[in-house]
UniProtKB/Swiss-Prot annotation:
This is 6,7-dimethyl-8-ribityllumazine synthase. Disulfide bonds: none annotated. It comes from the Bacteria. PANTHER family: 6,7-DIMETHYL-8-RIBITYLLUMAZINE SYNTHASE (PTHR21058:SF0), 6,7-DIMETHYL-8-RIBITYLLUMAZINE SYNTHASE DMRL SYNTHASE LUMAZINE SYNTHASE (PTHR21058). It catalyses: (2S)-2-hydroxy-3-oxobutyl phosphate + 5-amino-6-(D-ribitylamino)uracil = 6,7-dimethyl-8-(1-D-ribityl)lumazine + phosphate + 2 H2O + H(+). Belongs to the DMRL synthase family. (2S)-2-hydroxy-3-oxobutyl phosphate binds at residues 89-90, 131. Pathway: Cofactor biosynthesis; riboflavin biosynthesis; riboflavin from 2-hydroxy-3-oxobutyl phosphate and 5-amino-6-(D-ribitylamino)uracil: step 1/2. 5-amino-6-(D-ribitylamino)uracil binds at residues 26, 60-62, 84-86, 117. Its EC number is 2.5.1.78. GO terms for cellular component: cytosol; riboflavin synthase complex. The gene is ribH.
């Protein structure tokens, strides 16, 4: 059964899971809130604090590099990408959004590890502020659900 508002299942159990989080520092006021909401939800779902590894990188383009290092260690049941890209006046927004997203997806497929992508992309700061908590919670829920699903399928 899926939640009425979101695509994640209602009952999730993270008790046995090891989760890696990579957080971009760029737009740190937003990404810190994303990370806090994500961590709180992981703990609420039963993931043990000692089984959560959280690292920081400069920006969204560096997130896939750290995710790859974590995926190569084969210690994590799921990974989470956290970042915030706000549109500016140049093409840089599209470049960073597209490349970071493609990198995250490629890693999930190449390493067969679920990666919840919460690198939020918005037109302005107001949109980012409105999404920061919800998207952090969503990322935690997606990571736990997908880790459990892949375990069930293996």
């Amino acid at each position: 059964m899926f939640g009425a508002d979101k695509g994640t299942a209602d009952k999730l159990d993270g008790k046995k899971l090891h989760i890696g989080i990579v957080q971009a520092r760029f737009n740190e006021n937003i990404t810190n809130t994303l990370a806090a909401a994500c961590r709180a939800e992981l703990l609420r779902l039963g993931v043990q604090e000692k089984h959560i590894r959280h690292v920081l990188v400069p920006g969204a383009l560096e997130v896939p590099v750290a995710l790859q290092a974590m995926a190569e260690r084969d210690e994590y049941d799921a990974l989470i990408a956290l970042g915030c890209i706000i549109r500016g006046e140049t093409y840089h927004f599209e470049l960073v959004a597209n490349e970071s997203g493609a990198g995250v997806t490629r890693l999930a497929l190449d390493y067969q590890v679920p990666i919840a992508n919460a690198i939020i992309t918005t037109e302005n700061l107001e949109q980012a502020l409105a999404r920061q908590t919800e998207k952090g919670v969503d990322a935690a829920r997606v990571a736990v659900e997908m880790a459990n699903l892949l375990e069930e399928l293996s």
